[in-house]
Amino acid sequence: SCLREGSDIDRIAEVIQNVPGRPLVVVSALWGMTDRLFRAAREPQYAGRLVNDLKSQHLLFAPGLDTGEFSELFKKVISGISNELVNLSSGEYSLRSENLILAAGERLSALAVAHRLRSIGLDANPIGAEDIGLKLKGKGRASEIDISASSEKLEREKLIGIPILTGWFGEGEDGDIAILSRGGSDHSAAAFANLMNASKLILWKDVDGIKRLNPRWGIETPAIDYLGYGQASELALHGTPVIHPATVSPLIEPGIPLEIRNIKNPTTDAPTVIGPDFDLDSIVAIGCQPGVSVITQEGPLNSDLLSR
């Protein structure tokens, strides 16, 4: 997440105020929040301290959230985290309880962003993705969003004003909450772009686009100015940490362009734009997939293994 401090929400406000047309905003949890929620779900003994820390951190981002227009929703989410942590601390693991705890990060983020935007006069409205019919493929944990089912069920009339939507989770095939893999808010944003016939999707990150080499390798390379959908998917699958691997799939059929922008430099041109595949022959980047091993078995040329 690029939501590290309150000033990042101010940058979001600046973007919204200057964007043409009607924006729809999809948020992830505040920076570091999902890791802490994962730990609390797996180690409930940290529950009491975590809940207090969550409340304090979000109030630093959005002062007055606990007394403002969304105060009841804020208290409900905080209380929900406490209740689910109590359930887990009883010793009986529940994927549903864990999912509800994890999804609270996005819910709190949407409330904090909406509250802060409202404080400067923007008509921002926090909305839970599963509350308006976003359907996921899977139960509990899902690989991707079901665009076809979501298109039929999505309650678009609830997207009023400037919607601040939760990323990363939705409604699973069993009607209960389901979450995507880590970084799935990118995919959520792309799905909403598809479902709302958006002219463009912008992913705001804390990096300058997708680089030719993974910056974690310690070699500085320039950003790739243009990537095809297929190229972007391949890089996401092979070690490029900027976007979720499923991000571009909802964008391909409608041909929606995707821009990767740096929230720290909102007025500069997009370092990387993703769109239709044009040039499939040139090498644009190098990626790798860690944790993969090759096993080679050697034997005489007349070995029976060769005929199997």
Which residues does each PLM region occupy?
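A conserved regulatory-domain signal marking ACT and ACT-like small-molecule sensing domains
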Residues: P271-R308
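Acidic-aromatic/histidine active-site loop/patch
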Residues: L251
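Short beta-strand-to-turn element immediately C-terminal to the catalytic PLP-Schiff-base lysine
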Residues: A40, R261, I274-G275
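Nucleotide/pyrophosphate-binding catalytic subdomain
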Residues: S1-I243, V248
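Binding-interface segments
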Residues: L258
